[in-house]
From Swiss-Prot:
This is Glucose-6-phosphate isomerase. GO terms for cellular component: cytosol. Belongs to the GPI family. It catalyses: alpha-D-glucose 6-phosphate = beta-D-fructose 6-phosphate. The active site is at 146 (proton donor), 177. Its EC number is 5.3.1.9. It comes from Calanus finmarchicus (Calanus tonsus). The gene is PGI.
């Protein structure tokens, strides 16, 4: 009730409602609140009995596991919401108890620091090969950049090293037709590829669509790793019937060095459980990086 966008929307909805209801006393029966501030909830006209509370230390970008997740539960059903929580809980336990050399969030965290602080990478691409996850990168733009894009360490001293990367990305082959040119031929843009093994739409042309997506997923990561040297390029152009002059002219543009850093993250199927685990995985990765950088991943003074 103190966030400008949220309260503006709420007041607009209230105004629309009162055009028909005529009496503000009916707001109490037709609105519910998710808030930490009982006083402002009641001033708005909502019955405190219809207020779903959560702790005031829960930041927005980590709040979906709390009562704030009600909109998710209403959309997918509470049983599925519990599966989402269970997936996150599984990852919590993995993060808590697995030795660091096999700890997925820790490995992701130190790889990000290795690329960013030692190789000068300033971005991190999240590339889901499943349309159901098309907003995954956008979700973690806030999760990562608002958490670790910090100017000072915990004690208030100015940092003298890079902290959070710029997070970006698009799903599947959409990105291939937009920016893969850059990640193949320009260094220092680490990428996380993620994909389910099985599709929810396997009945479409006997699974052809997902087979194509998976083929692209595997081919892109292999190409980013191996690259293509001049000798291979020239051999391909010669086989295509190009003249020596054409090979000499075109060859340099088709060469790329490889050794581009990627992570391949796969799940059996995108479900509430696996999605919850993946979200928690990145949350713990962000936390781990914040600890190593000695910054507070849970404030956002730059926003405030």
């Amino acid at each position: 009730f103190t966030t400008q966008e949220t309260i503006t929307n709420a007041n607009t909805a209230k105004q629309w409602f009162l055009k028909s209801a005529k009496d503000s006393k009916f707001v109490a029966n037709h609105f519910v609140a998710l808030s930490t501030n009982a006083k402002l909830v009641q001033e708005f006209g909502i019955d405190k009995a219809n207020m779903f509370e959560f702790w005031d230390w829960v930041g927005g970008r980590y709040s979906l596991w709390s009562a704030i997740g009600m909109s998710i539960a209403l959309n997918i059903g509470f049983e599925n919401f519990e599966h989402l929580l269970s997936g996150a809980h599984w990852m919590d336990n993995h993060f808590k108890s697995t030795p660091i050399e096999r700890n997925i969030p820790v490995i992701l965290a130190v790889l990000g620091i290795w690329y960013g602080n030692f190789y000068g990478a300033e971005t991190q691409a999240l590339l889901p090969y499943d349309q159901y996850m098309h907003r995954f990168a956008a979700y973690f733009q806030q999760g990562d950049m608002e958490s670790n894009g910090k100017y000072v360490v915990r004690a208030g001293d100015k940092v003298n090293y890079s902290t959070g990367p710029i997070v970006w990305g698009e799903p599947g082959t959409n990105g291939q037709h937009a920016f893969y040119q850059l990640i193949h031929q320009v260094p220092h843009h680490p990428c996380d590829f993620n994909s389910p093994v099985k599709s929810h739409n396997s009945e479409l042309r006997d699974g052809l669509h997902h087979t194509i997506l998976l083929s692209n997923f595997l081919a892109q990561t292999e190409a980013l790793m191996k690259g293509k040297d001049r000798q291979t390029v020239e051999k391909e152009l010669k086989a295509a019937g190009k003249s020596e002059d054409e090979i000499k002219s075109i060859g340099p543009h088709k060469e790329f060095t490889g050794n581009r850093p990627t992570n391949s993250i796969m799940v059996d199927t995108v479900t509430p459980f696996t999605l919850g685990a993946m979200i928690a995985m990145y949350e713990h990765k962000i936390f781990t990086q914040g600890i190593i950088w000695d910054i507070n991943s849970y404030d956002q003074w730059g926003v405030e």
